[in-house]
Amino acid sequence: MKNVVALILAGGQGTRLGVLTEKIAKPAVQFGGKYRLIDFTMSNCVNSGIYKIGVLTQYKPHLLNRHIGIGKPWDLDRKDGGVTILQPYSTEKVGVWYKGTADAVYSNIEFVDSYSPDYVVILSGDHIYSMDYNELVDYHVAKSALGTVACMEVPLSEANRFGIMVTDLENRIIEFQEKPKFPKSTLASLGIYVFQWNFIREVLMEDAKDENSTHDFGKDIIPKIINTKRVYAFPFEGYWKDVGTIYSYWESNLELTRPIPPFNIHDENWKIYTHSEEMPPAYISDDARVKNSLISEGCEIYGEVYNSVLAQGVEVGEGVIIKNSVVMSRVRIGNNCFIENAIIAENVVIGNEVKIGVGEFVENKLNSRVYNSEISVIGMDSVIEDKVKIGKNCVVGIDKIVSKSLTSGEYI
């Protein structure tokens, strides 16, 4: 790999994930049974031979910091390079929060300078995909580009959620719209950039002085630098998913249970590394039934699990039926429960004879923009007491004790 430093933007709150990110940053949310979202970007880096990595954290970083540690699971505990957690710090002139994605990189110029790189790759820490960044950098070099933006085609109905590009026949970006109401194309930025470091360094320093800038790559930096006529789009044709909503998070997890999933977490040639607890193998009893599901280490299954993803250390009692659900680590489920179309966050305790996901769909009373499907969400460290019924599209916040039933659309 050429002399490259990677910066992973991992400070996002992920407000559209609701209670799932009340205690932790979005990149720290569990995914696929044993992983956290940031694992996919971190693994892409080391699989691409990039071992000089800065992780820029901000919102509730403690679990994320502990998860990454010194980077040992990714072979990043090394003298030359490795991974460095870069949190906002206060000086006499600068506040303690990054003002935007560009300001986050600007605030860590000294870190990048310490490696004297030719190129910097800037990545998001909360997307699901596999990409060889060598191909991205090689494309960038071949084009003699100052900047390159990875992109893919998206449905027109979703284009207003992305930065949208218009390109010429050589893939040169000639226009960039950030989340436009009326998109001029369906070519969307994936939030994956490579820049010549000396070039983007100067751009960021100029942007920092601009009082009218929001200091954001999509809103300010990319639209500004396309005037150089040396900023290109890199077409990406693999699987890429922004699991930024409750539904997309649930759907992307359950896609992994298909016989041939659209995203392969079992690829021996492109492994996904993570920091995980040492747990014994999963135990599935004689009376249990498991079909089309991912069952992680340390699980004990005495009931029935269908089309679901269970993270490490989940206990499923006798007479339990779980369907189309995502259950995060160390959840304990009592006996004779029914759970369907649910996301249950870490360390939740569910009593006996509990039902979750029953009844008819009703619009959510807490936030119908965030919670807008039949999926019910149970926040971290909550307790659902015996015989409680929870309807569809319900929300239980973090650290709650639920002793009374909730009809569809209700919250606590």
Swiss-Prot record:
Pfam families: Hexapep_GlmU (PF24894), NTP_transferase (PF00483). One of its GO terms (molecular function) is glucose-1-phosphate adenylyltransferase activity. Its EC number is 2.7.7.27. GO terms for biological process: glycogen biosynthetic process. The keyword Repressor does not apply. It comes from the Bacteria. Transmembrane segments: none annotated. The keyword Transferase applies. Pathway: Glycan biosynthesis; glycogen biosynthesis. It is an enzyme of class 2 (transferase). Alpha-D-glucose 1-phosphate binds at residues 98, 163, 178-179, 189. CDD domains: ADP_Glucose_PP (cd02508), LbH_G1P_AT_C (cd04651). It catalyses: alpha-D-glucose 1-phosphate + ATP + H(+) = ADP-alpha-D-glucose + diphosphate. Belongs to the bacterial/plant glucose-1-phosphate adenylyltransferase family. Involved in the biosynthesis of ADP-glucose, a building block required for the elongation reactions to produce glycogen. Catalyzes the reaction between ATP and alpha-D-glucose 1-phosphate (G1P) to produce pyrophosphate and ADP-Glc. Homotetramer. PANTHER family: GLUCOSE-1-PHOSPHATE ADENYLYLTRANSFERASE, GLUCOSE-1-PHOSPHATE ADENYLYLTRANSFERASE-RELATED. This is Glucose-1-phosphate adenylyltransferase.
